[in-house]
Amino acid sequence: MNVIGIESSCDDTAIAIVNSNREIIANVVISQYTEHLPYSGVVPEIAARAHLKNLQYAMKETLNQAKINFTDIDVIAATSGPGLIGGIIVGSVFGQAIACALGKDFIAVNHLEGHILAVRLNENISFPYLVLLVSGGHCQFIAVLGVGKYKILGQTIDDAVGEAFDKTARLLKLGYPGGPIIEKLASKGDPHKYSLPLSMTKKSGCDLSFSGLKTAVKQLIFSIESLSEKVICDICASFQYTVVQILLCRSINAIKLFESYCSNNFKINRKNYFVISGGVAANQYLRQEIFNLANTYGYCGVAPPSNLCTDNAAMIAWAGIERLNANLFSSNFVPRAKWSVEEL
């Protein structure tokens, strides 16, 4: 079975073809980097127009990569939320039009579910498992009991991790997107040079907060008269270290909540998995620290490959396959900007 996946929820136009044997036959991503760079962030209207321009080319390139045509396609899956509504509508309607023309099923996919299930495209891990989903717009600890069966154990009460990275990069005039730039500079800096607040780490539960950290970084930057390359590297290292320490601290509580929740609702596996996914999970320092923590608590730390952590259509196609296999889909779905995984 061959499934086309379409992803357009933010600033990357992506189309992929994945089959039911867990093979990525084609995977095309068209970046909108140059369109948004002058604004140091994503402009929704510009993003939607770029998706409209890029989708037809991306589809043609995907079919060329796969060396197949539309008659070999069985199902169309497209991100239908959450995210920037303009881009979501463009991608979802594009997918529905193709499905209608081919007489094939259309599956509306939750973007976050794509991140949650992406690890199973490569690892084929069993349910249940714990996910730390860290991206530009979301930061959540999620108990994954099965396809469409999710419990949010904790989440950010204000800003997402990726947003904090981008904001810090803007303050330092480093460019966009901020995550990869800060990670690179942090490797050259001293992570203990500047002390930054470990927000909410003393509280129970596993909710998170990054607004205080953003404010502290802003105050630190404005207090330094000359931002030399060494100083910038030290700020990046201290910021990244603090983010990771916050996530590690809250992960310990998340593991305890996950085990408690599963013991009441599900038979937990002998081998437990702690998955980190989402765009920020491409950060190798964060990934390794989470793996180390998972191992300490008897879990196997896993993550999708870096190219499946950032927004991509292969994870959307795979989520479509998972939903099709579970018979959990409806072609009649209205795209939405907000859509919790607990509503699936």
Curated annotation (Swiss-Prot):
Substrate binds at residues 133-137, 166, 179, 283. Its EC number is 2.3.1.234. Pfam families: TsaD. SUPFAM superfamilies: Actin-like ATPase domain. Its main location: cytoplasm. The keyword Cell inner membrane does not apply. InterPro entries: ATPase_NBD, Gcp-like_dom, KAE1/TsaD, TsaD. Gene3D superfamilies: 3.30.420.40. Keywords: Acyltransferase, Cytoplasm, Iron, Metal-binding, Transferase, tRNA processing. It is found in: Cytoplasm. Its cofactor is Fe(2+). It catalyses: L-threonylcarbamoyladenylate + adenosine(37) in tRNA = N(6)-L-threonylcarbamoyladenosine(37) in tRNA + AMP + H(+). GO terms for molecular function: iron ion binding; N(6)-L-threonylcarbamoyladenine synthase activity. Binds 1 Fe(2+) ion per subunit. GO terms for cellular component: cytoplasm. Required for the formation of a threonylcarbamoyl group on adenosine at position 37 (t(6)A37) in tRNAs that read codons beginning with adenine. Is involved in the transfer of the threonylcarbamoyl moiety of threonylcarbamoyl-AMP (TC-AMP) to the N6 group of A37, together with TsaE and TsaB. TsaD likely plays a direct catalytic role in this reaction. Belongs to the KAE1 / TsaD family. This is tRNA N6-adenosine threonylcarbamoyltransferase.
